[in-house]
Every structure is written in C-alpha cells, then in structure tokens.
C-alpha cells in the first residue's frame, strides 16, 4: 500500500526497508515503524489524514526544521533523516526520522508529572536562530457553542467571554505546541523522547502547559491535570494564566457540524469538568 513511500525511505537510508509496522496514535498521519536490511530502525510520517493532508508540506517541513534546531540540545527529539514535503516520491508529504526508545504512558504518577514539567522547561529554554511561526489558537470563534450535554453551560459561556477579551501580554517562547503525555516516550520512569513537532510555534509558555493539563484531564481526570498546573507554576516561577488554560480547553470543542473530538462520553464529561475548573481559576 505504501510501496512508493517505503522505496523512498530505503533510498534515504541507503538500505532497503524490510518491515513497516503501524504505530499507535497519529491523528494527523499514518506513522510507520521501519526496519531496513542493515537493521536500522526509523519512523516514517505520511500525512494521509485530512484536513492535515492538505497542509502536509507545511506541517512536515515545520517538524523537520524543529528537529534540526533540537539536534544539539538536551531535548530528546527524533533526528530528521529525510523529507519529501510535496510528496513527489511518496504521494503525500512524508518525513523520515530516527526512532527513539520507550513507550507512551498508560497511567500517570506524581513523578511523571515532575518529569514532564522539567522537560517542558528544557524545551522552552531552546532559542532558535529564527523564531517559528506565532502560535495559532485552536479555539476559534465558530467553536464557541456550549456542548449539548454539558453540566456546566454557564462555565462555557464565561469561557467564551474570556476568549473574547484581549489576550494577556506574554514573553515569546519556543513551544512544542502539542505538548502532553501522548507525545512523550518513557522507559524506566524517565522520558526518552518527545515526538510530533508539526505544530512547533512561538507563543506563551503557559499554552504548552495548558495543553498538557487538558490532555491529562481528558484522558485521566482533573487531579493529575490540576497537579501538573501546580508543578508548572512552581517550575516556571509564574502563576497560572487563565486565558491560556481556557483557550486550550475550548480548543477541544468540535467545529460546527462535526462530532465531538472525543467519541467516549466519559472523556467528553471530563473535558466539561476541566473547563469548569479552569474558568473558575482552579480554586
């Protein structure tokens, strides 16, 4: 099915690809774990899923550029090996990168949250020679519709009012922009990799922290999310900024006419609960 893409990857690697196994995740893309005849393992991203496929050249190029910036930093990011941004050889935008050891979390502990906060500070300390694009909000106004089965409709309305107000000033910071436990690899309790750099941006540090917290709230519950916010406040030496926490939570609402991002009603309920907390300032 991916013969052209695998042939291209083999030409980049200098060794024929002998196996290609799907990796979990990959909302935007098909992610394949490759092994070539020389025994080298790598990962191939193919931008197959809409609407990201239509922006595949931009997204895959940004990921490669971010990984190049990170080569000589303490951030454990994959190494970019090859890019076919226009899909000339592969049919869709393709990015070949090294494969990092480790696996995603299935449960989260206080020690994991500490490690996440420390890594986020390490990411934010990176100073690219040229800044990446200014962040894009995923909470655009067309999404500002109270979820049908919300237990906190007034909280959503207040959230929309927060976003309608001017955003607070911030110090431009290098952002992963999709930072969270889903994009981290772990081994023996330590982070061995941070992946998925297609959304790398410049923006407020609290937006990265907010996204990590929202993910924790939706996938687990509010307690690890609240704990991560507290840990990031301590690590960064800054107070939580409600605007960015609200922006990230609202960003999980679907565009008009689309189903909820999370098909699991329990996840939808946890998002609803988290939004209520962040609107009230996590008091």
Spans of features found by a protein language model:
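A glycine-centered beta->alpha junction motif in the catalytic cores
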Residues: 48-50, 86, 94-107, 145, ...
């Amino acid at each position: 099915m991916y013969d052209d893409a695998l042939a291209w990857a083999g030409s980049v690697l200098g060794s024929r690809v002998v196996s290609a196994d799907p990796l979990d995740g990959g909302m935007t893309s098909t992610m394949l774990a490759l092994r070539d005849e020389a025994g080298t393992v790598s990962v191939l991203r193919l931008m197959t899923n809409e609407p990201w496929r239509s922006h595949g050249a931009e997204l895959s190029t940004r990921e490669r550029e971010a990984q190049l910036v990170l080569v000589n930093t303490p951030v454990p990011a994959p190494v970019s090996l090859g890019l076919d941004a226009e899909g000339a050889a592969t049919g869709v935008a393709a990015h070949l990168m090294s494969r990092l050891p480790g696996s995603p979390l299935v449960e989260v502990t206080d020690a994991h949250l500490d490690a996440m906060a420390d890594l986020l500070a390490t990411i934010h300390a990176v100073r690219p020679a040229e800044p990446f694009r200014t962040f894009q909000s995923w909470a655009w106004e067309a999404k500002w519709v109270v979820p049908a089965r919300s237990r906190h409709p007034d909280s959503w309305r207040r959230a929309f009012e927060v976003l309608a107000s001017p955003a607070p000033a911030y110090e431009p910071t290098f952002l992963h922009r999709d930072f969270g436990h889903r994009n981290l690899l772990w081994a023996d309790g330590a982070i061995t990799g941070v992946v998925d750099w297609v959304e790398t941006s410049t923006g407020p540090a609290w937006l990265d922290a907010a996204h990590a917290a929202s993910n924790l709230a939706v996938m687990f519950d509010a307690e690890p999310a609240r704990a991560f916010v507290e840990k990031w406040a301590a690590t960064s030496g800054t107070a939580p900024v409600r605007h960015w926490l609200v922006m990230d939570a609202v960003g999980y609402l679907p565009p008009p006419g689309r189903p909820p991002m999370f098909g699991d009603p329990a996840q939808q309920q946890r998002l609803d609960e988290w939004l209520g907390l962040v609107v009230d300032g996590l008091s």
